[in-house]
């Protein structure tokens, strides 16, 4: 097992937003714009349709003609500090795990989706009757929490382990959940798709499902070095064996109890 000390690489400060601003329609749109590296127009318009659930509206995205002609999907790519958690309160359910992504970069699809949805609500167009009473001025927006997006719809997703100069390993995430939950937070990319627009009173959010997680297959651990500084140590000798045996995984609190949140949790969709 190799133990290669890697010095931390200083990165430029990431955009930040106050919790209050992220709970307004204008604030969440501006934040999503700030983490987008492009303003290329992707979305022509969005339609919210009534669903079988009173509080949920399905989301239909119409891409620009140029993107539609290329058969472009409506998936959204994110990048950020990523951690898979066990959900203590739901261990016997299909959503026994969830992904937390502290987003540092996002496709312009994200801000344009938010912009289109709340533009529809503001102008009372392309929305079901159940949303006509909403005002963008009084909505408490919950898509982001602590600058993070939480995803508990993981079924059917794939995980791709990547390493520079080597072939990637692609697997169904169902068989990787336990080992991934034991990893420390690390930078990763995620491809997600919007599921529904959810409303509870004046609280609203767009919920997402994971389609693919792209993560470095090297397992690292944070240790306190001889100098007293925190260092990242590679614990990977053979990637295939490590993935199977969960080597190099540190003992951390890898469980998160949503019920311990002081705020009343918004409906998980």
Curated annotation (Swiss-Prot):
Cite a GO CC annotation.
host cell cytoplasm
Membrane spanning segments where? none
What Gene Ontology terms for biological process does this UniProt record contain?
Answer: chromosome condensation; viral DNA genome replication
Task: Write out the GO MF terms.
Answer: single-stranded DNA binding
Q: Tell me one Pfam family matched here.
A: Pox_I3
Alphabetical UniProt keywords: DNA condensation, DNA-binding, Early protein, Host cytoplasm
Q: Name where it's found.
A: Host cytoplasm
Among its keywords, does the record have DNA-binding?
Answer: yes
- Function recorded in the entry: Plays an essential role in viral DNA replication. Binds to ssDNA with high affinity and localizes to cytoplasmic factories where nascent viral genomes accumulate. May disrupt loops, hairpins and other secondary structures present on ssDNA to reduce and eliminate pausing of viral DNA polymerase at specific sites during elongation.
Further details from the record: This protein is synthesized in the early as well as at the intermediate time of infection.
Q: What is this protein called?
A: Protein OPG079
What organism is the protein native to?
Vaccinia virus (strain Western Reserve) (VACV)
């Amino acid at each position: 097992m190799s133990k290669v000390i890697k010095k931390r690489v200083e990165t430029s400060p990431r955009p930040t937003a106050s919790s209050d601003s992220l709970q307004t329609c204008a604030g969440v749109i501006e934040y999503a714009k700030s983490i987008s590296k492009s303003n290329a127009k992707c979305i022509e318009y969005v339609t919210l349709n009534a669903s079988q659930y009173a509080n949920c509206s399905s989301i239909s995205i119409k891409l620009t003609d140029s993107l539609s002609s290329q058969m472009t999907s409506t998936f959204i790519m994110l990048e950020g500090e990523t951690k898979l958690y066990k959900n203590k309160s739901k261990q016997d359910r299909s959503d026994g795990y969830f992904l937390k992504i502290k987003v540092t970069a996002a496709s312009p699809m994200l801000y344009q989706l938010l912009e289109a949805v709340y533009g529809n609500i503001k102008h009372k167009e392309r929305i079901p009757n159940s949303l006509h009473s909403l005002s963008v001025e009084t909505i408490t927006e919950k898509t982001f929490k602590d600058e993070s997006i939480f995803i508990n719809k993981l079924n059917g997703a794939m995980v791709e382990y990547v390493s520079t100069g080597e072939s990637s390993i692609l697997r169904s995430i169902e068989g990787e959940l336990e080992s991934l939950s034991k990893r420390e937070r690390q930078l990763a990319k995620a491809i997600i798709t919007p599921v529904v627009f959810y409303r509870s009173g004046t609280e609203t959010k767009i919920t997402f499902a994971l389609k693919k997680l792209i993560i470095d297959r090297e397992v690292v651990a944070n240790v306190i070095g001889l100098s007293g500084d925190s260092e990242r140590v590679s614990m990977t000798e053979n990637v295939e064996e490590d993935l199977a045996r969960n080597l190099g995984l540190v003992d951390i609190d890898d469980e998160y109890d949503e019920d311990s949140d002081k705020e009343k949790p918004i409906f998980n969709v």
